[in-house]
């Protein structure tokens, strides 16, 4: 690892520890030339995932877009910022695991809806209204009815 001060490539590791919930390794290093101490992080390089849009175009998966859309759906709900970050991380992990370098944007949308439905019904309705392009009250009512029906089925299976 190159020293940020003198550019020497020889350093020794003073300390290593897990960081980012085990997704990276934090190393404290010391330059053998100038004794400057610095920190490095090592992460597994993830395979780039290409998103196939409805119009046939492709673009690289953008976690920030995912975060923005989910954050908007979760505004003024009991979903904390940390919970949103964890939710987005979980969706990203599923996308990387399930896709073979390519995934349709519709698959991402359905994956988000499936997971939001379990986590927060209000955020689910908000996201669904944009993703499924609700045209009026009827669309909201049918989605609410399906939520209501699934809640009854869950209660019946518990009883």
From Swiss-Prot:
InterPro entries attached to this UniProt entry: ATP-cone_dom (IPR005144), NrdR-like_N (IPR055173), RNR_NrdR-like (IPR003796)
**Location of the region described as Disordered in the Swiss-Prot/TrEMBL record:** 1-21
Name the residue ranges with Polar residues bias: 1-11
Name the UniProt key words of this record, in alphabetical order: ATP-binding, DNA-binding, Metal-binding, Nucleotide-binding, Repressor, Transcription, Transcription regulation, Zinc, Zinc-finger
Q: Name one GO biological process term.
A: negative regulation of DNA-templated transcription
Q: What does this protein do?
A: Negatively regulates transcription of bacterial ribonucleotide reductase nrd genes and operons by binding to NrdR-boxes.
- Bound cofactor: record note: Binds 1 zinc ion.
The family classification in the record reads: Belongs to the NrdR family.
Q: Does the keyword ATP-binding apply?
A: yes
Name under which the protein is recorded: Transcriptional repressor NrdR
Task: Give the protein's cofactors.
Answer: Zn(2+)
Q: Which HAMAP family match?
A: NrdR
Task: Report domain ATP-cone positions.
Answer: 49-139
Zinc fingers typed unnamed, residue spans? 3-34
Q: Name one GO molecular function term.
A: ATP binding
